[in-house]
C-alpha cells in the first residue's frame, strides 16, 4: 500500500508501474469471480446484438438508418449518466484451444504456435465489449453509442511461447474514464501444466461516438471504491499525460534533441569513405544494413468480410495484418524467427472504408543488442480519386537470439525514423525494467 500511495501524485516511473501491476491483477481477479463468462469467438456476435448491426452486407444500409434513430437516447452531459464501477465492466472470455481442437486451425501457425495476429483481433473485440459493459443501459434494447478503438497504448508480452493446444483466458475491465474516452486493461493467461501462467498485459483506449459515428458522445463516469482502484485510475491519468508529452515532442513537430543530433552525425561520419574525403561518397560499415534495404510492403483489398459492427474495416484485422508484415520484415532482416516483446503506441487516425486499397509498409528502424524495432505504416488509397490517407502507424519490438546487424540511415527522413524507433525501443525497455 505504501508503494502505491507514496507515488500517486508523482511522475510516472518504472518502479511505480511494476509496483502497481500486482494490484491490477488482484483487482481484476476479484471482479472476475462474478463476471459474465463467455467464449471468445461469440464476442463479435454479442457486439452486433448490442448495436443492432447487420449480419449480411446487403442489409448494412438499412441497419445504419435504424441506428440513426437512437440519437435521441444520448446524454447531453456526463452528469445525466449514472456512475459505474470497475466491477460493472469486468469480463472473462475463454479460447478453448485445449478442450476444443477444432478451433486450433484458425489460430495455428507454421511453427506450431499460436498466431499472435489472431490474439490481437480477439483483444480488440474484447476491449470494445468491456466498454459497452461499462456504458450498458438495461432500459434500452440497443446501445446508442458507437464505441471504437482510438489507440493501443501498450501490449507487454510476459512469455515467449503461446501453446496451440492449451486453453487461453482473457480477463479485463475499465480502468479509466474521461468524458468521451475510456481505457480498458486486459490480461491474458494460458492453462499449462495444471496452472494459469501470464501471457500478456494490454491497455486499449476507446472513444464513444454517436450512433452515426459522426461526433463524440458522453459516457458514464467511473466510481472508485477502494485505494487500489484509485491507484489504477491514477495510472490511467499518467498514461494520458505521457501520451500528450510524447505527441508534443514528436519528431514531426520539433527538432531532435542535442544528444540525438550528435548520434545521427556520428552515424553519418561512420559511413564516409576515408579514401575520398568527400561528403557524397558513402560506404556501409561492417555488420550493417542500409535502412533502404530493410523494408517490406504489402497490399490488402478491403472486403466486406473484414468489416466491424459499424461497417468499417475491423481494427483487429488491421493490427493482425500490420503485425504479420512487421514480423516477416524482422524475420527476413535477420534470417531467423523473431519473438515479440511489445506493441505500443498504435493510433487509429482514420477509419478504413470497405472497398479501399490498404497499403502497408514495414521498416526496420532501429536495432540494439538482440532487439529489433519495426515500424509499420498503413494508408488507404481510394482507387477512384487516387488520394492517399494515413490510417495507422504501428510499433513492434522483437527479440532474436543471435547477432543482429545495425541499421544505418542515409537520408534525413530515414534518420528521423531511426530516432523515432530508438525512442520507442527505449520506452519499451523502461516499461519492462
Regions flagged by a language model, labelled:
Residues 295-347, 351:
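Eukaryotic modular interaction domains in large regulatory/scaffold proteins
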Residues 31-56, 60-115, 222-315, 430-432:
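Catalytic strand-loop segment that frames the active site of acyl-thioester-processing enzymes
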Residues 114-142, 314-338:
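Active-site helix/loop of acyl-thioester processing domains in fatty-acid/polyketide metabolism
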Residues 1-46:
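N-terminal mitochondrial targeting presequence
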Residues 30-72, 161-256, 354, 365-433:
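HotDog/MaoC-like acyl-thioester-processing domains
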Residues 112, 116-119, 131-149, 161-163, ...:
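Single-stranded nucleic-acid-binding OB-fold domains
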Residues 140-144, 149-161, 166-169, 335-351, ...:
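A cross-kingdom feature marking solvent-exposed beta-strand/loop segments within repeated
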